Amino acid sequence: MHSDPRPLKAFGFKDAQEVLDTVLDPGHKIEFIRIVFPDILGRPMDFAIPASELKDTFRDGKGFDGSSIEGFVRIEESDLVIKPDPATFRVFPWTYRGFAEEAVWREGLMFGDILTPEGKPYEGDSRYILKRTLAMARREFDIDDIKCGPELEFFIFPDDRTPRPTDEGGYFFSGCHGEVRKEIQLLLHRMGIETEYDHHEAANGQHEIDLAFLSALDMADTAMIFRYMVKKVARMHGLYATFMPKPINGQNGSGMHVHQSLWREGKNLFFDPDHPYRLSETARNYLAGLMAHAREISAVCNQWTNSYKRLIEGYEAPVYIAWGQRNRSAYIRVPEYQPGKERATRIELRSPDPACNIYLAFAAMFTAGLAGIRDKEPLPDPVEENIYRMSNSRQKKHEIRTLPRDLEEALRIMEKSGLIRETLGEHLFDGFLANKRRELAEYANNVPGEYDKQVSDYEVRAYLPFL
């Protein structure tokens, strides 16, 4: 009878050699490595290699046909190479058992960098776009770290066909499936992914698990693993988890509020003890940049037709471009914190949803904020009243603009944005627009008539099974 795999270190590897030593130890039974990368929409793509191939793959990379992935590459330049990043190596916290007695194995996971055959970074790689943005922040603004913490909300349903809630719990009510949230966290912890807390969200069947703050690239990779683990654990319980932004009419949708701050040499650049909101000039300019470019980054942060069914009045989602401290109807909130917790100074961008391409969304929002610093963008006055209840005249007095009404408007604005074109690069910019226009055409063919904020049956059929 075959013995179970030995306990092992599952994360936090310093280099490729340490990964190889762990993988090739026969007692660990790590037989396969999944190499993961995002497609143009941020969905996880992966393929597995046998452990015996890992040494050569670290050295040479692995070739693949990029034209097989929709919107990823032009067919005349389809040959690409992916090189695994050893810093991202983790071991899945379970053991696979096949029908044969000897079929017992573990799997590892690594994110990969996509290269051209000449060894240059591939312009269509979303992960590279975020890396390039972070390099720009270091080079032009002397910012050595952007820390962020997204709040990814999700629904749990009985299956992937009908958005039928499995409970009637509300915000912080116990509801059902607390054990699902706990198991997700236990497995994440075993992979070195820290969480802060979990709770039932406001809508029926809606949940949230908050991830501990990380540097931006690490967080984007972590969010990809998080979405995979949420769905896998739900399946293990005979349920279906979805990050679809708005699956149910008359209920709150799922957001991905992104808390963020800029750091230099271990110092939070957003903190100023003398400002009423404890925000430094850097923070105020950054916040103003996010507001100034809010409409331009919307298509990236809210990339689905269904995303705009969430961004409507009355469901705790932002519609108006304003900021405040306690104001949850605003586009940006500045969370309060206890005295002595100055490192927690941050801003919370409330518009993104968890079905975005998180690499591109991070790149877009960081570039917008940094543009505010570069341009010394003036910060409008805060708005602390409920904007949904403000009269039109008061909204005009505060010069409050609105986010795009729908994906079509968001794409029109994005297409004219030099900031987003430069951030994404020509290849991804054009590919993203083309992909989203096809989506709009399919929506129009299946949902005739004037655009409606109600979630259509078509959206449930089209989005629920894969978001």
Residue ranges and their predicted role:
Residues 1-467:
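Glycine-rich, acidic/polar active-site loops that bind/position phosphate-bearing ligands
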